[in-house]
């Protein structure tokens, strides 16, 4: 076994990477509130795992979406548990994200030289809220339908470009299959991809700059 490890160590310098990960200095003022970002990440990973599991059963059509969610909850093995964990972790992710933003703001973590870390964090906060908006519609029940109708109708108040924006969001003049398809694509592909990209920008900057000092 040691020969296998030595072979990889010679080529990848695993020990140096491990030392870099485990030897970062942690300031004495750090407390549990500095873990909120990590908890948010954990919730996101739970979302990815449970959401991926539900894609095997969910059908993104206006005629079958609600029935497929019912099937997940009543007939699919552990489907009720997977969807419940998905829903609970979604709520937890939003809550932890809000608390994390407040913690960073109140402790001055957005100040020089961490401006870019703050900007990427704000983008991640917007993406998190977008997950909630798009995911809420996917069961295509009465609550989801009317929530989508209200949310997508908000831009209509914008002069000149309002109506085109509404049609872009809905995929047509009214809420229907095109709207559900758009929201499903956003929720399961576009938003997770963008979130992963901005996380890959956010975390290395934290590693590079370290944790901000006390006020």
Curated annotation (Swiss-Prot):
GO molecular-function terms, A-Z: electron transporter, transferring electrons within cytochrome b6/f complex of photosystem II activity; metal ion binding; oxidoreductase activity
Query: What name has this protein been given in UniProt?
Result: Cytochrome b6
What the protein does comes down to:
Component of the cytochrome b6-f complex, which mediates electron transfer between photosystem II (PSII) and photosystem I (PSI), cyclic electron flow around PSI, and state transitions.
Query: What does the organism's lineage look like at the top?
Result: Eukaryota, Viridiplantae, Streptophyta, Embryophyta, Tracheophyta
GO CC: one term?
chloroplast thylakoid membrane
What domain of life is recorded for the organism? Answer: Eukaryota
For heme b 2, which residues are the binding ones? 86, 187
Which SUPFAM superfamilies does the protein's record reference? Transmembrane di-heme cytochromes
Q: What is its main location?
A: plastid
């Amino acid at each position: 076994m040691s020969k296998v490890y030595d072979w990889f160590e010679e080529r990848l310098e695993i020990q140096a990477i491990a030392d870099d990960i485990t030897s970062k200095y942690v300031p004495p003022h750090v407390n549990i509130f500095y873990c909120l970002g990590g908890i948010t990440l954990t919730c996101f990973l739970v979302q990815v795992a449970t959401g991926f599991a539900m894609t095997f059963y969910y059908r993104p059509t206006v005629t079958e979406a609600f029935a497929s969610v019912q099937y997940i909850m009543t007939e699919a093995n552990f489907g009720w548990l997977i969807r419940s964990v998905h829903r609970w972790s979604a709520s937890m992710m939003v809550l932890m994200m809000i608390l994390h933003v407040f913690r960073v703001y109140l402790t001055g973590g957005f100040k020089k030289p961490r401006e870019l870390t703050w900007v990427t964090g704000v983008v991640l906060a917007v993406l998190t809220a977008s997950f909630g908006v798009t995911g809420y519609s996917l069961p295509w029940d009465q609550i989801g339908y009317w929530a989508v109708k209200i949310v997508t109708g908000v831009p209509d108040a914008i002069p000149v470009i309002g109506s085109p924006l509404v049609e872009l969001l809905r995929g047509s003049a009214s809420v229907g299959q095109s709207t559900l398809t758009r929201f499903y694509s956003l929720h399961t592909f576009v938003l997770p991809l963008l979130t992963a990209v901005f996380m890959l920008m956010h975390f290395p900057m934290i590693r590079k700059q370290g944790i901000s000092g006390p006020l």
